[in-house]
A protein has these predicted regions:
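Exposed extracellular interaction/assembly regions and N-terminal maturation sites
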Residues: 3-113, 149-172
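A gly/proline- and charged-residue-enriched helix-loop-helix capping module
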Residues: 107-126
């Protein structure tokens, strides 16, 4: 199969493998994410300060032509975050719309002595890693994928310190 190189964002209706220097974005500040600019990229957070990353509103509209690459449905859009260092403020990932929620789990480990798995509550819409009890140690990973109407599936893996606590809440 021939190989094609694109310099701008590509929207695939059947998935693809992305690799290259533009697939990882380094930032020291939070932002409101978009599907066109941020989906499918690894966001490498390099600051210890508080930052908020706001996920795009889930768009579940059914296209009249499911093969149209310009459809607005964003099912399958994935946003991945990696912390380069332990945060001293709060690293926050939240939904943009009060209609959207997150479902998933967080695996938080404290040194070699304890580990906990936290599940989202029905109304969860925010992930907060505080650098201590809810995670946020360097190397932490947060992944959010649009999986259905008003729903993101989330996965959190992080080290922590102190008495472990859930990173999930309802704040939007």
């Amino acid at each position: 199969m021939a190989q094609t190189t694109f310099s701008g964002p590509v929207k695939s209706l059947a998935g693809f493998i992305s690799a290259g220097v533009s697939n990882s974005v380094t930032t020291a500040a939070g932002k409101t994410l978009t599907v066109a600019n941020d989906a499918g990229k690894q966001i490498y957070y390099t600051s210890t300060a508080t930052a908020t990353f706001t996920l795009p509103t889930v768009n579940a509209s059914s296209p009249s032509d499911p093969t149209d690459p310009n459809q607005s449905n964003n099912f399958g859009a994935t946003f991945e975050f990696v912390l380069s260092t332990t945060v001293t403020g709060s690293f926050i990932v939240k939904v943009n719309s009060s209609n959207d929620t997150v479902v998933g789990t967080a695996i938080i480990g404290e040194g070699t002595t304890s580990m906990a798995v936290f599940s989202t509550a029905t109304a969860s819409d925010t992930i907060t890693l505080n650098g201590t009890t809810t995670g946020g140690v360097g190397g932490a990973n947060v992944k959010a994928t649009v999986v259905g109407a008003n729903r993101y599936k989330v996965e959190v893996v992080s080290g922590a310190t102190g008495a472990l606590a859930t990173p999930f809440s309802a704040t939007v």
